Regions:
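Phosphate-handling DNA/RNA-contact segment within nucleic-acid enzymes
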Residues: 4-85, 98-99
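Conserved acidic, small-residue-rich alpha-beta core segments centered on
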Residues: 86, 98-109
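Acidic, metal-coordinating catalytic cores used for nucleic-acid/nucleotide bond scission
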Residues: 49, 70, 89-99, 117, ...
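Short, hinge-like loop/turn segments at secondary-structure boundaries
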Residues: 81-82, 103-105, 131-137
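Flexible glycine/proline-rich, aromatic-decorated loop/lid segments
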Residues: 75-78, 104-106, 145
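C-terminal or mid-to-C-terminal helical accessory/interaction module adjacent to the motor/catalytic core
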Residues: 112-183
């Protein structure tokens, strides 16, 4: 069970205690529905309300990771159940950091991963309410690869007018591509 703080204070979601019957790290919210639709692609969102909102608008392959901390057990569940995982976490700092952590887990499990980058809203719920499911699906179809996402995040964190940052950027990109570093 979970409740959501309506004033967007931190933490947004407050979960009931875990016990031998329920452990949120082993489950994905709405996973049973997504599986029923036999989708080869699952859109993983951060919050329960994101998943509920997407389902209400006909996007039945959305699941929520029950917070920002994707676990290895959740990753294995996804790996066994679909061909592609599209991460659509919130655009805030916590959501972006969680995206990076989740990417690492899913990459290590051998998942085909894409990252949803919506514009004009803070999360999938707000976006689909504001712009509709067709436009949301347009962004899903344009979800970017893991390498592309990491390169974009790296660009944001460095000053590419600075020579040292430029070298750091190139070395990191080369590392991501599995090549040798530049001197």
């Amino acid at each position: 069970m979970c409740i959501r703080d309506r004033d967007d204070s931190k933490p947004k979601y407050i979960n009931s205690p875990e016990d031998i019957v329920y452990s949120k790290g082993r489950h994905l919210f709405a996973f049973n529905i997504a599986r029923k639709y036999n989708s080869k692609t699952i859109i993983m969102v951060e919050g329960y309300m994101d998943a509920v909102s997407l389902h209400q608008r006909g996007i039945h392959n959305a699941v929520a990771s029950l917070g920002t901390a994707l676990t290895e057990a959740q990753g294995r569940l996804l790996r066994r159940s679909c061909e592609k995982v599209i991460i659509g976490y919130d655009a805030d700092g916590a959501g972006q950091a969680a995206t990076l952590r989740g990417l690492e887990i899913l990459q290590n499990l051998g998942c085909d991963i894409r990252i949803l980058q919506i514009e004009g809203a803070k999360d999938p719920d707000e976006f689909v309410v504001k712009y509709g499911p067709e436009r949301f699906q347009m962004y899903v179809n344009k979800a970017i690869s893991l390498v592309e996402f990491k390169v974009k995040m790296l660009k944001k964190s460095l000053d590419l007018d600075n020579v040292n940052d430029k070298i750091k950027f190139l070395n990191e990109v080369i590392s991501q591509l599995g090549l040798q570093n530049v001197e």
